[in-house]
């Protein structure tokens, strides 16, 4: 592995607005979380033993639950949110409908002051020369191509053939024949919005705008990184169905494949299959997504929350920038 790897800093999990308190039973510096102005506690089994540590953490968790249930929601606009974007188990409906509908949402919200992040560096292959034109400045275009090449070189250094694994079997069954097709569908999630900056994995944006985050394409890894970067809600499009979620921030599943929406209805939050089969448009699909976001940010549970899909997966191997 040539020693060229790093582990992303996930201390930003502490700023996630959906998490009112923090309790950790792991090797972590608690002072990393104190700047986020939330109750925080840490426990170590060293010197206490497993059972004693579990008891201490459970009692503190009970205290934190009492504190959290006393908090009250404050009114805010969707344009004040930090939002993460992801697609998984993509098919032709992803590139033609659900991703473009999210692209309309991205255009609307970034133009009104929201912060939006997208990533999946290796799955931009074949669309990188198109995406690079969306960056606001020449220096960002240069930086993006450097970041992309570094990631691709890293993949090759591990003896992995990306073009031999993408698109995957599910993508192919859904009508995607090449990585270029998949990548072109992927970037539809940002619409015609301009990219304001580039982030490292789990790095929080410092100001509003649309950001590219250099990440793995693995669903659990990316959702975890976006949550650590402060995503209050995440928009996840799927064609064939993907059940991954996170305990840190709500994940809204969006689908335009009628068969998936019918057979996996309990896993889909926004059915916009009418864009493909008739009865609705990209604009009405975007409206449905934004209406769902408003409900979720007001307390409504997403499918992943109700079904307890609570994956947490820090990226384990990543190119050193």
Name what the model sees in each region:
Residues 53, 80, 85, 91-321:
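Anaerobic metallocofactor- and corrinoid-dependent redox/one-carbon enzyme cores
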Residues 1-30:
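Flexible C-terminal active-site loop/helix
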Residues 14, 19, 61, 83-85, ...:
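Buried hydrophobic positions in well-ordered alpha/beta secondary-structure cores of metabolic enzymes
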Residues 6, 39-41, 115, 211:
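Conserved beta-strand segments of alpha/beta enzyme cores
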Residues 19, 26, 31-73:
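Active-site cavity-forming subdomains of large catalytic enzyme subunits
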Residues 8-10, 37, 78, 249, ...:
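Short, solvent-exposed loop/turn segments at the edges of secondary structure
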Residues 72-82:
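Glycine-rich phosphate/diphosphate-binding loops that line cofactor/substrate pockets in enzymes
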């Amino acid at each position: 592995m040539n020693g060229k790897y790093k582990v992303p800093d996930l201390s930003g999990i502490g700023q996630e607005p959906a998490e009112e308190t923090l309790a950790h039973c792991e090797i972590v510096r608690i002072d990393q979380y104190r700047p986020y102005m939330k109750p925080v506690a840490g426990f170590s089994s060293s010197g206490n033993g497993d059972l004693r540590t579990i008891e201490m953490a459970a009692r503190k968790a009970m205290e934190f639950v009492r504190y959290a249930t006393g908090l009250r929601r404050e009114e805010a606009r969707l344009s004040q949110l930090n939002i993460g974007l992801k697609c998984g188990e993509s098919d032709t409906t992803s590139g033609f409908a659900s991703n473009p509908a999210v692209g309309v949402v991205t255009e609307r919200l970034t133009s009104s002051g929201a912060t939006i992040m997208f990533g999946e560096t290796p799955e931009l292959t074949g669309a990188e020369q198109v995406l690079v034109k969306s960056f606001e400045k020449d220096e960002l275009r240069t930086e993006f191509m450097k970041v992309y090449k570094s990631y691709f070189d890293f993949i090759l250094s591990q003896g992995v053939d990306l073009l031999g694994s993408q698109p995957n079997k599910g993508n192919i069954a859904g009508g995607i024949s090449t990585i270029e097709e998949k990548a072109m569908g992927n970037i539809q999630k940002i619409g015609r919005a301009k990219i304001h900056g580039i982030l490292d994995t789990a790095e929080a944006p410092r100001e509003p705008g649309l950001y590219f985050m250099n990440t793995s394409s693995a669903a659990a890894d990316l959702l975890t990184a976006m949550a650590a970067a402060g995503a209050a809600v995440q928009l996840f499009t799927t064609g064939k169905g993907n059940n991954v979620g996170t305990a840190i921030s709500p994940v809204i599943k969006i689908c335009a494949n009628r068969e998936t929406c019918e057979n996996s209805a309990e896993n889909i939050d926004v059915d916009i299959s009418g864009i493909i089969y008739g009865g609705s448009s990209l604009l009405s699909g975007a409206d449905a997504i934004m209406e769902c976001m408003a409900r979720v940010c007001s307390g409504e549970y997403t499918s992943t929350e109700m079904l307890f899909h609570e994956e947490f997966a820090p990226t384990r191997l990543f190119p050193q920038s």
